[in-house]
Regions:
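Auxiliary Fe-S-binding modules of radical SAM enzymes
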Residues: 2-27, 235-313
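Conserved dinucleotide-binding and phosphotransfer motif residues
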Residues: 106, 160-161, 304
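Iron-sulfur cluster-binding cysteine motifs and their immediate structural context
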Residues: 43-50, 69-85, 98-114
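N-terminal pre-triad scaffold of radical SAM enzymes
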Residues: 15-69, 86-94
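Conserved AdoMet/S-adenosylmethionine-binding subsite of the radical SAM
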Residues: 118-275
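N-terminal-biased segments
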Residues: 26-27, 34, 52, 56-61, ...
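Acidic/glycine-enriched edge-of-secondary-structure segments
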Residues: 5, 107-112, 200-204
Length: 313
């Protein structure tokens, strides 16, 4: 990460979304905060706007009224909608800001905002009444631990108020960071997407050796009962029984009562790639897996040592 960004993250955080009344990101009713930046480059990423640690512009094609105001700020003197995809390379940062300020339809917006821990806490506490009955706050991304100082500061502030905390992580982080944050976390949702290391490198851009090391640390820690290992079912990449078999065997050998969650494919990500001017990995967006298909994936996990299976269909 560039040094200037590291300095910013020491004082503030960059968030790209806050999802209120979330029911799939932990127990109870939750507020999920999405932190920007990820060291992995999963080709199917469900939140492509969260990969870069820097703030980027998005083009909302459905809002555009083709007024051509953006044209005068383009290096090529072409309106944004005249390209199949919006490319920020055609605009300087100053030009993008001018478009955001002048577009009458708000068709171009930055994908994230800079906030202090106190500002974010104030925003979160608007929902505090809903955190009773096991609700709380979940940090997602991107990779939340990329902004480790900001994340840990937020976790401490929430625990001071006895608010339940959770994190969704791909675990491609230094183990010492995990050790520092764990005392302030009630639940950890940790991804292991692909067991084979070469395939993992090919489709995520990184080795999974550190990820496996961190999973081993978590499943041997005092909080192992509050760790849920997850695998998203991505057609062509992760959704095969051999992958589930190997992951299930690996994690159940580390902790026999491990909780393993199998997540259904999310077809809603495709539109995000269009907004970000990026190409999606699927030419034709696959559908959700059926309930029967998801149960079959779960059966494979159970046959390979998993006692506590969670299926999100």
């Amino acid at each position: 990460m560039p040094e200037p960004l590291m300095e910013i993250f020491k004082m503030n955080g960059i968030i790209f979304d806050i999802k209120r009344f979330a029911t799939h990101d932990g127990n109870g009713i939750r507020t999920t905060v999405f932190l920007k930046g990820c060291p992995m480059k999963c080709v199917w990423c469900q939140n492509p706007e969260g990969i870069s640690a820097e703030r980027k512009p998005l083009f909302f094609k459905n809002r555009c009224i083709k007024c051509r105001i953006c044209e005068k700020f383009s290096k090529e003197k072409r309106a944004i909608f005249e390209n199949n995809n919006f490319s920020e390379q055609r605009f300087s940062s100053k030009d993008i800001q001018n478009i955001i300020e002048n577009c009458p339809a708000c068709a171009v917006q930055m994908d994230s905002k800079l906030v202090s821990s106190n500002e974010l806490l104030k925003e979160i506490l608007r929902d505090e009444i809903f955190f009773t009955h096991e609700g709380g706050v979940t940090f997602s991304g991107g990779e939340p631990f990329i902004q480790k100082n900001f994340l840990i500061e937020m976790l401490k502030k929430l625990k001071e108020r006895n608010i339940h905390t959770a994190v969704e992580t791909a675990l491609n982080i230094d183990t010492d960071i995990l050790k520092e944050a764990l005392p302030y976390l009630d639940t950890v949702y940790a991804d292991l997407k692909i067991f084979d290391d070469e395939k993992h490198k090919k489709y995520t851009g990184v080795s999974n050796k550190l990820i496996k090391k961190n999973i081993e640390f978590l499943l041997k820690s005092s909080k192992k009962e509050n760790v849920i290992i997850r695998t998203p079912m991505i057609p062509e990449f992760t959704a095969d029984k051999e992958n589930i078999k190997k992951i299930s065997s690996f994690i159940s050998e580390l902790y026999s009562d491990v909780k393993y969650e199998i997540l259904n494919y999310n077809p809603l990500a495709e539109s995000k790639y269009e907004m970000a001017g990026k190409e999606y990995c699927f030419k034709e967006n696959p559908p959700l897996y059926s309930g029967k298909e998801m149960k079959d994936f779960g059966k494979t996990a159970e046959e390979n040592g998993i006692k506590k299976i969670i299926i999100e269909s």
